[in-house]
Swiss-Prot record:
Enzyme Commission number, as recorded: 7.3.2.1
SMART domains from the UniProt entry: AAA
Gene name linked to the record: pstB2
Residue intervals of the ABC transporter domain: 23-264
Role played: Part of the ABC transporter complex PstSACB involved in phosphate import. Responsible for energy coupling to the transport system.
Protein name (record): Phosphate import ATP-binding protein PstB 2
A Pfam family that the UniProt record links to this protein: ABC_tran
GO BP of this protein: phosphate ion transmembrane transport
Main subcellular location of this protein, as a coarse class: membrane
Organism: Enterococcus faecalis (strain ATCC 700802 / V583)
Annotated ATP binding sites: 55-62
């Protein structure tokens, strides 16, 4: 495969006065033992926008995403250095309450992972764990979350039904509803439609576009068409580094870096 100069990069710098920043990383490195999976990534994520992370398998995009709310903490021999700045706080420090932080920076995984409970209990379980006991308030949160995830009309008459009986696409939207029930500011999604059929994928994409009015969304995807359709910004990862970061339309029509152009045009990956 063609070799690229990894120092040849183009990273858009957002103007925080005009483009409010929800989250940014500074010189972020992620190690698994002696293997450096992420090599000094600086990225800014604009509030209430969708940012897509793209790149070939093994480039580090999912590792980077998981580092943003410290999901890598539970992996043996993993180590993260650098800053993950959220509301002027570096969440990559021992002083941060990780459990509370993950309420603000939620995560939806590649494969739907509903609890083996009812649809209603999937939404309310974490809320109850945090002390919410008011039945009326819980009912309101369930309805609001399911409506935002475009699932309410399909399940409103069967909230006591097992979540495992839902279709794959419905399960993934339930997982999105479960995440937003905690009222996060940021929603991280790791290839949320990769296991779904085209119709379900389209529904999830439409849901995410509608959600950005209330949430900042960062999504890993292997689907170039998906990134082009729904994201405002795109970051191209390659060999643990961000090679190019820009408005999505520029990444897909006028990339500045040869490696980016070769990847989005299908020459490798």
């Amino acid at each position: 495969m063609k070799e690229y100069n990894l120092n040849d990069t183009h990273l858009l710098q957002l103007d925080s006065q005009k483009d409010p920043i929800a989250l940014h990383t500074e010189d972020l490195h992620v190690f698994y033992g002696d293997n450096e999976a992420i090599k000094g990534v600086d990225l800014q994520f604009e509030k209430n926008k969708i940012t897509a992370l793209i790149g070939p398998s093994g480039c580090g995009k999912s590792t980077y995403l998981r580092s943003l709310n410290r999901m890598n903490d539970g992996i043996a021999n993993s180590r993260v250095t650098g800053k993950i700045m959220y509301k002027d706080v570096d969440v990559n420090t021992k002083e941060v309450d990780v459990y509370e932080m993950r309420k603000r920076i939620g995560m939806v995984f590649q494969r739907p992972n509903p609890f083996s409970k009812s649809i209603y209990e999937n939404i309310t379980f974490a809320l109850k764990q945090h002390g919410e006991k008011d039945k009326k308030k819980l009912d309101e949160i369930v309805e609001t979350s399911l409506k935002q995830a475009a699932l309410w009309d399909q399940v409103k008459d069967n909230l006591n039904k097992s979540a495992l009986a839902l279709s794959g696409g419905q399960q993934q939207r339930l997982c999105i509803a479960r995440a937003i029930a905690m009222k996060p500011d940021i929603l991280l999604l790791d290839e949320p439609a990769s296991a779904l059929d085209p119709i379900s994928t389209g529904t999830v994409e439409e849901t995410l576009v509608n959600l950005k009015d209330d949430y900042t969304i960062i999504i890993v995807t292997h689907n170039m068409q998906q990134a082009a359709r729904i994201s405002d910004y795109t970051a191209f990862f390659y060999m643990g580094k961000v090679i190019e970061y820009d408005h999505t339309r520029k990444i897909f029509t006028r990339p500045k870096i040869q490696a980016t152009e070769d990847y989005v045009s299908g020459h490798f990956g």
